[in-house]
């Protein structure tokens, strides 16, 4: 496939993912905002995740497309474009980790859960996690970057005359060192939370199964536990999808760092596919919610019917007065 055609396909797929990410995750935020049944601390963390995914669609994907074309710009502008997606990725990981801890507390200490995990505390944790995500994602601005070796777009003489005016080719690997991406970002900030989440969900299932085996458990308590297990399965599925979507791009980064010769000849289609897969993760979560959660499914249908499809039937109320009422038909 010619390079131009390959780039065109990549850009088209990225734009499609951006549209799906924004649409689906705005729907998630709207669902939690309009449904009292969905306004729980757990779902506040999912809204944080959805907000990160909306930002991926609105900003990170356009930035990624821009960077993939290798246009010329000043170093720090390019570095910001490259780092912004790292902020959103880190925020997503922290949101998933917070959800895992939240679900563990719900199963481990059900009687104290409501007093421990309140809406105010959840919002405070979310704010702290976003601040931490920005700190981690923007670390290259503190000096861990490739400014000194970045390939520039100007003539060598021009760069030597006025370094501040030197434009560089805006490519991710031209501004962010692989040592940062592998040692700090992947080994330090991505892999540990994923492993912690794996341990937490294993513990959730073990604790819940032990409690379900207790013969003296009341029917109501058994129903609550079964519901918690179902929720944990859904959230574990989201974590699994996140890992599957993001591990390929991190694997390529590791190969680029540890096998420098391969880094010079790695196929562009492999890089683009890995990047597309990582961005596809932002479009998948709303589908999981709709498939696995009855309340989300109901609220999605309600919002789409009322505000998008405008399904209303006319009601005559009194003389000459016309009213409208939304109609919902849910097959749940």
From Swiss-Prot:
Q: Which GO terms describe its cellular component?
A: plasma membrane
Residues that hold adenosine according to the record: 173, 253, 278-279
Task: Keyword check for Membrane, yes or no.
Answer: yes
Q: Which residues lie on this side of the membrane: Cytoplasmic?
A: 34-43, 102-121, 203-234, 291-332
Tell me the compartments it is located in.
Cell membrane
Residues crossing the lipid bilayer are: 9-33, 44-67, 79-101, 122-144, 178-202, 235-258, 267-290
Which loops or segments lie on the Extracellular side of the membrane, by the record? 1-8, 68-78, 145-177, 259-266
UniProt-recorded Gene Ontology molecular function terms: G protein-coupled adenosine receptor activity; G protein-coupled receptor activity
Record keywords, A-Z: Cell membrane, Disulfide bond, G-protein coupled receptor, Glycoprotein, Lipoprotein, Membrane, Palmitate, Receptor, Transducer, Transmembrane, Transmembrane helix
Task: Say where the lipid (S-palmitoyl cysteine) is covalently attached.
Answer: 310
Q: Gene3D superfamilies annotated for this entry? A: Rhodopsin 7-helix transmembrane proteins
Q: Does the keyword Lipoprotein apply?
A: yes
| Record membrane topology | Multi-pass membrane protein
Which parts of the chain are coiled coil? none
Pfam families for the chain: 7tm_1
Q: Which GO terms describe its biological process?
A: adenylate cyclase-activating G protein-coupled receptor signaling pathway; vasodilation
Q: List the disulfide bonds.
A: 78-170
Q: What is the role of this chain? A: Receptor for adenosine. The activity of this receptor is mediated by G proteins which activate adenylyl cyclase.
Entry-linked PANTHER family: ADENOSINE RECEPTOR A2B, OLFACTORY RECEPTOR AND ADENOSINE RECEPTOR
Protein name from the UniProt record = Adenosine receptor A2b
User: Species name for this entry?
Assistant: Bos taurus (Bovine)
């Amino acid at each position: 496939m010619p390079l131009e055609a390959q780039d065109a396909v990549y850009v088209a797929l990225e734009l499609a993912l951006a549209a799906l990410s924004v649409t689906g995750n705005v729907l998630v935020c709207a669902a939690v905002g309009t449904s009292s049944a969905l306004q729980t601390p757990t779902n506040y963390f999912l809204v944080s995740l959805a907000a990160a995914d909306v930002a991926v669609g609105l900003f990170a994907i356009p930035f990624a497309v821009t960077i993939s074309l290798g246009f010329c710009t000043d170093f720090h502008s390019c570095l910001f474009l490259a780092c912004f997606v790292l902020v959103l990725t880190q925020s997503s990981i922290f949101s998933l980790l917070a959800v895992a801890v939240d679900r563990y507390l719900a199963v481990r200490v059900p009687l104290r859960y409501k007093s421990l995990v309140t809406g105010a505390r959840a919002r405070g944790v979310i704010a702290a996690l976003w601040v931490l995500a920005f700190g981690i994602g923007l670390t290259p601005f503190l000096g861990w970057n490739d400014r000194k070796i970045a390939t520039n777009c100007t003539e060598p003489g021009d760069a030597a005359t006025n370094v501040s005016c030197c434009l560089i080719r805006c490519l991710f690997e031209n501004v962010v060192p692989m040592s940062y991406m592998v040692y700090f970002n992947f080994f330090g900030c991505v892999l540990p939370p994923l492993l912690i989440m794996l341990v937490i969900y294993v513990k959730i299932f073990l604790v819940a199964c032990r409690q379900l085996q207790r013969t003296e458990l009341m029917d109501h308590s058994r129903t609550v536990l079964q519901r918690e297990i179902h929720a944990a399965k859904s959230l574990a599925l989201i974590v699994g999808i996140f890992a599957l979507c993001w591990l390929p791009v991190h694997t390529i980064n590791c190969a680029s760092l540890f096998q420098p010769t391969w880094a010079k000849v790695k196929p562009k289609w492999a890089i683009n596919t890995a990047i597309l897969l990582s961005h596809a993760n932002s479009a998948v979560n709303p589908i999981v919610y709709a498939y696995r959660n009855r309340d989300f499914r109901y609220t999605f249908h309600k919002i789409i019917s009322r505000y998008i499809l405008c399904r209303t039937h006319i009601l005559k109320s009194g003389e000459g007065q016309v009213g409208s009422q939304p109609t919902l038909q849910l097959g749940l």
